[in-house]
């Protein structure tokens, strides 16, 4: 599986499991809903800053977040 798809699926699963909209996630990590949508659709790969803020939002370390993505590769 391509990395952009693995990131997309992981982010979508975490977000939906927590019951958070793309808009709420974007607001929490100082981003935009459109950017979150593009990531979840595999069109963009998030910056390290966005990955870090997203991991924090979901109470995950960068290592744990990366491991979830790696499981899909």
Residue ranges: model-predicted function:
Residues 19-38:
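Short alpha-helical DNA-recognition segment
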Residues 56, 64-73:
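Short, charged recognition helix plus adjacent turn
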Residues 1-17:
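A short, Lys/Arg-rich alpha-helix, primarily the initiator
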Residues 43-56:
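Short, basic-rich loop-to-helix N-cap that marks the start of a DNA-contacting helix
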Residues 41, 60:
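Short, conserved catalytic or interaction motifs in soluble domains
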Residues 16, 27, 56:
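Alpha-helical residues within the helix-turn-helix
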Residues 10, 21, 47-50, 61:
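Residues that mark the N-terminal boundary/hinge immediately upstream of a DNA-recognition element
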């Amino acid at each position: 599986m391509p990395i952009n798809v693995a990131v997309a699926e992981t982010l979508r699963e975490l977000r939906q499991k927590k019951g958070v909209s793309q808009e709420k996630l974007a607001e929490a990590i100082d981003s935009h809903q459109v950017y979150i949508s593009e990531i979840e659709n595999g069109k963009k790969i998030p910056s390290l800053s966005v990955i870090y803020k997203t991991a924090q939002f979901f109470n995950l370390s960068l290592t744990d977040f990366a491991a979830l993505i790696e499981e899909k590769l």
